[in-house]
A protein has these predicted regions:
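Catalytic Walker B motif of ABC-type/P-loop ATPase nucleotide-binding domains
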Residues: 155-159
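Helix-to-loop junction immediately C-terminal to a conserved catalytic motif
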Residues: 50
Length: 294
């Protein structure tokens, strides 16, 4: 697997939170989702990868050879969007355009305004409206328009789907695919989310985080095939309890989550066994991690 980013032993320590040590690879040419609950360390990891904050320990390699993000044109090749936006609230869409035009040689102003129009933000009469007067969703749209208007090889987007309505999230998914297809295997997206349901159809590779640690990762199909969902009667669940990682019991039907290697044993016991989708997998794996740390 060709990797656009490789992190080894990455640690970032704060007073009340520690990220890592994290070892991960971001596959080149795909859309990777960094998934975890609020406070899992997703933003800290992305900020550390992008050089917004310096790591306490560890190393990140970019594009197969670069270990210093400040080296050469590395930052020109990476587009970054922060979860809460990255521009002063006193700025206008016009200011955002001018800043990117001055800061990045690969920024296309005409493309920026086209995307603003496509995203329903910063119309002709709103080009000088301050970000302070915009809704949270419109500020995110503006940031996305700016980052997609640049010539980049890697996009790092922190919670890009947050505060967006369903229609705009659908457009964002389309923009993801368009970006990757234009790159013909040379462009990559890394984005974080705490709710994968809305972005599952554009997720090729997933990394799950819990309490500052990576707990699972892989291409989505392979990842889902490592586990199974189980359903059956309460009496049956009493017999298979030791094979389950997580279980839910109610008055009649019970549900559980197990490793795929337990499939034959679970089916022999009379349960219904299915492969989870990504959303189901994330919920149960995060519950299992929480259970292990309680």
């Amino acid at each position: 697997m060709d990797s656009v980013i490789v992190a080894k032993g990455l640690v970032k320590k704060y007073k009340k939170f520690t990220l890592g040590p994290v070892d991960l690879e971001i596959p080149k040419g795909f859309s990777t989702a960094l998934i975890g609950a609020n406070g899992a360390g997703k933003t800290t990891l992305l900020d550390t990868i992008c050089g917004i904050v310096a790591p306490s320990k560890g190393e990140v390699t970019y594009f197969g050879e670069i270990t210093d993000i400040e080296e050469g044109e590395t930052k020109e090749r990476i587009g970054y969007q922060a979860a809460q936006g990255m521009y002063p609230m006193s700025w206008t869409p016009y200011d955002v355009a001018m800043a990117n035009k001055l800061g990045f040689t690969g920024f296309h102003e005409e493309r920026y305004w086209e995307l603003c129009k496509k995203y329903g933000v910063a119309s002709e009469g709103e080009k000088k409206q301050t970000l302070m007067k915009m809704s949270d969703g419109n500020r995110i749209r503006l940031c996305l328009a700016a980052v997609f208007a640049r010539d980049t090889e890697l996009l790092v987007l922190d919670e890009p789907g947050s505060n967006l309505d369903p229609l705009m999230r659908d457009r964002l998914c389309g923009q993801f695919r368009e970006y990757l297809e234009e790159g013909d295997g040379e462009k990559t997206i890394l984005f974080s989310t705490h709710n994968i349901a809305d972005m599952e159809n554009v997720t090729d590779y997933a990394i799950l985080m819990y309490d500052g640690a990576v707990i699972e990762s892989g291409f989505v199909n392979e990842l889902c095939e490592r586990y199974v969902l189980v359903s059956g009667e309460r009496a049956t669940f009493d017999k298979i309890k030791r094979s389950l990682l997580v279980e839910d019991r109610n008055m009649s039907t019970c549900f559980g989550f197990a490793k795929a290697e337990e499939k034959e044993k679970l089916e022999a016991a009379g349960t219904v066994v299915e492969t989870p989708n990504l959303q189901q997998l994330c919920i149960f794996l995060l519950r299992y991690a929480e259970q292990q740390n309680s």
